[in-house]
Structures are given as structure tokens and as C-alpha cells.
């Protein structure tokens, strides 16, 4: 039995890395197989130069910086991150647009009144999550279009610090430095900071959750029950909060269960570790459900009406083959048709949309292979959505589009290096859960409404995998075996 579990662990580990490598390779081949693409030569040349010359500079640079005072190096990275992100949002200022306007103006209302009457928010309660946090700052500093960008810059800088800490545990100081530089240089992330959007907030919380998970993983064999419960409750609260902002908490929870019980098998023959793991995950799940219920009650109180409990509309749109699973007017009109019915609550409308979604899925008229393929490429195939949103104020849209996709595919290429190293060394460290998150997010997105900007959190996985690959793929003298490290 023990031999079977060990074999299953190794097989599952490699399978996850192979799936990521397959997804990334398909993206790369699909993107560059279109030789008629505008600026194709510039894009291909840029990605190749970044992958070869850029990786070399990052590897040698991080090796040099590793020998310096680490605290000073980290401090410089924080200052550079803050400076780069802040310079951009101060140079390119834009009023809230489309979905981002909904976030901002909802936050304004929440800063002025405890209860607001907005059926749209009751239909999509996650909007309340970010808007409620933003409303605190609007209440303190007053209404200003610049508060969301400044808040985003601060959150982005905190994220860099967490990326550094996580990457350091996975691959050492060199990997941490490289990951930080990649995060600082990521064009789309820098541009997204201009808007009132939830991604910087929920990704900072996600990184904090990962960091705590890694700490618990390191101590699981000897941790006392009180500290274990504190960590479990803290993670549960953070997951519930993150889900309030962006409903994706199921992905890291499932990833944690797979990592702790299938991949990491220290519990074999050790009853204490078994008990600690079961207690840890059990308290997280139960705590998450309790905190989520309390949060939903609070949102209902602030909106003055029952909120939707199911994403029926998002699933319905996700299976619209004609729109390739993206937003479309007819589906939106159907939702509001039900929502506007006399006596119907937001939850009634979403429950009805869930029924409509089931009928659509079971109709027999959907080519699922084509639909999922289209959604996969819509979700991950391009990284220039931020440019599209910022188009009205950018001086050269083509330049920023090329830069965004060039760097994005450089990340994809080098993240493939990272998973190849992980496959070779059967890496079962926290790198696994970060890789699995990207896969889980992608699979989840295939079931609901899709948009390119939703892959924002997946770029964090790419950054860490890329940094790992850049620093460890060509180390001939180093036999990387950090399976128990993080």
C-alpha cells in the first residue's frame, strides 16, 4: 500500500507539471503559428531575445545580487516596484470605464450610505467585495479617481514582497530576485493598476494564503494543535474574504487537498501528521463555510435584499457557443428579464438562469470541443486586454500591445522550463500547488463566462515558474531536489 501511494504521488506530481507544460506549449504554438499576425517578426524576435538574452541577464544578475546583503537587495526591489508602478499610474490617468466604473461608483455609494439599493450588485455579489474595501479609502480620503490606482500600486508592491518570500522558499534567493524583477516588469500588470478593479486585492490575499500554507507545510510534523488551529482559521477567513472579492476560493482549497493528501505523503506511517493534516484541512473547509455564510449575511444587510447564491448567469454565458463563452447582449437581456419580474429576488433570477444553463448544456447543440478550445484561447491566448481598456489615453496602442504579448509569451516559454525542471526532479514543494492553481483556474474558467483579463492571477504562477526555470534549468552542477523544502 505504501509503495502504491508513493507511486501515485510521483505519477500525480509529474502529471500536473505535464498538463501545465502541454497547455503552455499549445498556447505558444497556436500564437506563433499565425505568421500573418500583425508585427509577427517583431513579436517572435522579441520573445526569442527575452528568452535567451533576457534569461541570461536575469540569471547572472540574480546570481550577483544573491551575494550582496539580502535585506538591502529586497529593499531596493520594493522601492523599484513602487516607483515603476506609481510612475505609470501618475503618468496615465483615466476615469473609471465599463466594469471598472461599476466598482468605483458602487464604492462611492457604500462610502456614503450603509445600505444601498442596487439589484445589479445583488445579482453579482462579488462586486460588493472589492467595492466595500475601496469604499473605506473613499470615506477616509474623499472621492477621487486616483485612489484605486494608488491602492493598486500599494497592493502590487505587497504582492511583490510575497512573491519574493514564496519564490525564496521554492528555489532560493536567486529565484526570489528573478521572480520579483519579472513581476515589476510585467507590462499588463502595470497597466491594470490604472483601473478600479479587484485583481490586485484578491491576488495579494491569494499570495498571503499561499505563504501561510507553505509555513504550515514546513511545520506540519511538529506543530502544536493551538497554532495549527490559528493558522487554519486564518486561512479560512482569508479564503472567505478572497471569495467575496473574486469567487475562486474552491481552486486553492482543492489544490491544497491534492497537495497535502496525494502529493505530499509524509503522513504515511505517522499518525500525528495524519491527524494534523485532517484537522488542518477540516478546520479550513468548515471555517471557510462559516465565514462565507457570515459575509453573505453582511452583504445582504448592506444591499437591503437577498443576494444571489449561485452564478447561474455566468454558467449560462459560459456555454454559449455563438459567443465563445464571452459576454453577449442576448444572454444579459435574459438575466435582466427574469430579474425585473415582479416579486423576483436576485437569487430567483440566478436560479432560473442556472436552469436555463442546464437546458443549454443538455440541448445537444453544443460542440464542446470547439467551445472549450475557443474559451481556452480567449482566456489565455492574449495579454493585451489592459491596453484595450486604456486605449483612449495611450499614446501608442500598437507598441503597448506588442510589449504586453511579447513579455507574456516570454513568461510562458520560461515557465515551460520551470515545469521541465520540476518534472525531472519530481518536485513536490509548494511549486506544485502554484502550478496546480493555474491549471485549476483554467479548468474552472471553461465552465463559466470567460474574458482575457480573468487570467490575471494565473500570471503569478507563470512568474514563479518562469523564475524557477530561468535559475535552475541550466545549472549543470546542481541536482535540484527540494521536494521537502517548501
Roles of regions detected by a PLM:
Residues 1-87, 265, 273-286:
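Start-transfer (signal-anchor) and selected internal transmembrane alpha helices
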Residues 59-60, 150-170, 208, 413-420:
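Transmembrane-helix motifs of polytopic, lipid-linked glycan transferases
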Residues 92-106, 112-136, 142-146, 306-308, ...:
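Extracytoplasmic catalytic/substrate-binding loops of multi-pass membrane glycan-assembly enzymes
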Residues 297-385:
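Membrane-proximal stem/loop segments at transmembrane-domain junctions that anchor or position
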Residues 188, 194-202, 245:
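Short acidic/glycine- and proline-prone juxtamembrane loop motifs at membrane-interface regions
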Residues 34-48, 147, 371-444:
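Membrane-interface anchor segments at the N-terminal boundary of transmembrane helices
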Residues 163-185, 204, 226, 429-432:
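Transmembrane-helix signature of polytopic, membrane-embedded enzymes
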Residues 81-84, 179-185, 239, 243:
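Short helix- or helix-capping micro-motifs
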Amino acid at each position: 500500500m505504501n509503495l502504491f501511494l508513493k507511486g501515485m504521488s510521483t505519477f500525480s506530481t509529474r502529471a500536473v507539471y505535464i498538463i501545465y507544460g502541454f497547455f503552455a506549449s499549445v498556447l505558444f504554438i497556436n500564437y506563433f503559428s499565425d505568421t500573418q499576425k500583425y508585427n509577427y517578426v517583431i513579436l517572435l524576435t522579441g520573445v526569442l531575445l527575452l528568452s535567451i538574452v533576457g534569461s541570461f541577464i536575469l540569471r547572472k544578475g540574480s546570481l550577483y545580487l544573491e551575494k550582496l546583503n539580502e535585506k538591502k537587495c529586497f529593499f531596493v526591489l520594493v522601492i523599484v516596484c513602487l516607483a515603476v508602478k506609481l510612475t505609470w499610474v501618475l503618468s496615465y490617468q483615466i476615469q473609471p470605464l465599463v466594469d471598472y466604473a461599476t466598482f468605483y461608483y458602487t464604492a462611492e455609494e457604500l462610502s456614503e450610505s450603509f445600505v444601498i439599493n442596487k439589484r445589479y450588485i445583488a445579482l453579482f455579489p462579488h462586486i460588493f467585495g472589492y467595492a466595500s474595501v475601496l469604499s473605506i479609502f473613499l470615506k477616509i480620503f474623499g472621492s477621487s479617481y486616483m485612489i484605486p490606482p494608488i491602492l493598486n500600486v500599494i497592493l502590487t508592491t505587497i504582492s511583490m514582497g510575497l512573491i519574493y518570500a514564496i519564490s525564496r522558499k521554492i528555489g532560493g534567493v536567486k529565484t526570489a530576485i528573478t521572480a520579483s524583477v519579472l513581476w515589476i516588469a510585467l507590462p499588463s500588470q502595470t497597466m491594470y493598476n490604472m483601473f478600479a478593479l479587484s485583481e490586485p486585492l484578491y491576488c495579494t490575499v491569494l499570495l498571503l494564503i499561499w505563504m501561510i500554507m507553505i509555513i504550515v507545510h514546513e511545520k506540519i510534523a511538529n506543530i502544536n494543535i493551538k497554532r495549527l488551529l490559528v493558522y487554519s482559521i486564518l486561512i479560512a477567513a482569508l479564503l472567505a474574504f478572497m471569495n467575496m472579492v473574486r469567487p475562486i476560493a474552491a481552486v486553492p482549497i482543492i489544490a491544497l487537498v491534492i497537495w497535502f493528501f496525494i502529493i505530499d505523503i509524509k503522513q504515511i506511517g505517522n499518525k500525528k501528521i495524519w491527524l494534523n493534516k485532517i484537522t488542518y484541512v477540516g478546520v479550513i473547509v468548515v471555517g471557510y463555510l462559516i465565514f462565507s455564510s457570515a459575509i453573505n449575511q453582511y452583504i445582504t444587510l448592506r444591499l437591503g435584499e437577498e443576494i444571489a447564491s449561485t452564478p447561474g448567469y455566468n454558467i449560462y454565458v459560459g456555454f454559449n457557443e455563438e459567443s465563445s463563452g464571452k459576454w453577449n447582449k442576448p444572454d444579459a437581456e435574459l438575466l435582466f428579464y427574469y430579474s425585473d419580474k415582479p416579486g423576483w429576488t436576485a437569487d430567483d433570477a440566478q436560479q432560473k438562469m442556472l436552469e436555463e444553463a442546464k437546458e443549454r448544456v443538455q440541448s445537444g447543440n453544443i460542440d464542446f470541443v470547439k467551445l472549450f478550445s475557443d474559451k481556452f484561447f480567449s482566456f489565455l491566448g492574449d495579454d493585451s486586454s489592459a491596453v484595450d481598456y486604456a486605449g483612449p489615453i495611450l499614446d501608442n496602442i500598437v507598441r503597448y500591445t506588442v510589449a504586453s504579448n511579447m513579455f507574456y509569451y516570454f513568461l510562458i516559454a520560461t515557465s515551460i522550463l520551470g515545469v521541465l525542471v520540476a518534472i525531472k526532479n519530481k518536485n513536490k514543494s509548494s511549486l506544485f500547488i502554484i502550478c496546480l492553481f493555474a491549471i485549476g483556474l483554467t479548468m474552472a474558467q471553461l465552465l463559466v463566462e470567460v474574458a482575457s483579463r480573468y487570467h490575471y492571477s494565473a500570471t503569478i504562477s507563470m512568474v514563479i515558474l518562469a523564475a524557477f526555470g530561468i535559475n535552475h534549468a541550466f545549472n549543470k552542477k546542481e541536482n535540484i531536489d527540494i521536494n521537502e523544502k517548501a
